[in-house]
């Protein structure tokens, strides 16, 4: 986030550039536009290094104590999105999160919660992302920030939840067929990120679009 309120980073396309920093890691630079200051509430934590659920909050607290004025400037939300460049870090590694149903704490019914996949947990810290944030902050005199949940609870965040509707040859080994039709249901197709069978390591929007177009091409014309 740029500290000078006279400077703005929003007056460009939403995703302005990208770079592959290593064989597995791809970084995109994103702006939210001028009227998304509420998103700043998700990022109001100083950039915090690697650790666990005990050490990362302590590192964050230490950062606040060392730089109190910088932290106070972070808490001012007005104009945040117009002065902030988001670093979207993606990796092509095979990792996963799992969904499970959990009874609601209050009232009836269930809710979906996420948890780390036991065999392929997704990372809670990506060093390349932190280094990119530090580099940009140094060269723009800006303030580098972390997602609040990552800094305070060592819980990662994701914008691209992919998979879940497995492509198979029958209901015994999949949810959808090669044309993304749900087994056992007529005229029901899965055309969102749930149908993507692997992690592309880049923004999946074009992959999802291409797969949706392929699925639609197999739908018979209405006569």
Spans of features found by a protein language model:
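Mid-to-C-terminal "cap/lid" subdomains and adjacent gly/pro-rich loops that border
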Residues: 1-80, 220-223
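Glycine-enriched catalytic-core subsegment of oxygenase/oxidase enzymes
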Residues: 2-5, 186, 203
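A glycine-rich dinucleotide-binding beta-alpha-beta segment and adjacent secondary-structure elements
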Residues: 85-88, 111-198
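Hydrophobic/aromatic-lined pockets within catalytic cores
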Residues: 1-3, 89-90, 141, 217-220
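Short, glycine-/Ser/Thr-/acidic-enriched flexible segments
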Residues: 2-4, 20, 34-37, 92-95, ...
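C-terminal catalytic lobe of FAD-dependent flavoproteins
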Residues: 43-138
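Internal hydrophobic alpha-helix adjacent to the cofactor/substrate pocket in enzyme cavities
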Residues: 132-140, 212-223
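A conserved FAD-binding loop/helix module that cradles the flavin
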Residues: 198-216
């Amino acid at each position: 986030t740029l500290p000078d309120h006279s400077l703005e980073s929003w007056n460009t396309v939403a995703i302005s550039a990208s770079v592959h920093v290593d064989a597995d890691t791809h970084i995109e630079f994103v702006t939210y536009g001028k009227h998304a200051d509420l998103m700043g509430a998700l990022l109001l934590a100083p950039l915090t290094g690697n650790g666990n659920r005990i050490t990362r909050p302590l590192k964050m607290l230490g950062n606040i104590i060392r730089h109190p004025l910088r932290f106070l400037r972070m808490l001012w939300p007005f104009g945040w999105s117009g002065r902030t460049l988001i670093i979207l870090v993606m990796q092509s590694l095979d990792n996963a999160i799992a969904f499970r149903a959990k009874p609601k704490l209050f009232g009836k019914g269930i809710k979906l919660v996420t948890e780390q996949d036991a065999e392929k947990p997704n990372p809670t810290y990506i060093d390349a992302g932190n280094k990119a944030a530090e580099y940009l902050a140094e060269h723009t005199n800006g303030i580098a920030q972390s997602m609040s949940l990552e800094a305070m609870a060592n819980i990662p965040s994701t914008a691209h939840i992919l998979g879940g509707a497995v492509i198979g040859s029958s209901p015994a080994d999949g949810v959808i067929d090669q044309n993304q039709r749900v087994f056992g249901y007529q005229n029901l197709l899965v055309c969102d990120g749930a149908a993507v069978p692997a992690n592309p390591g880049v923004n999946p929007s074009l992959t999802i679009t291409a797969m949706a177009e392929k699925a639609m091409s197999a739908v018979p014309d209405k006569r």
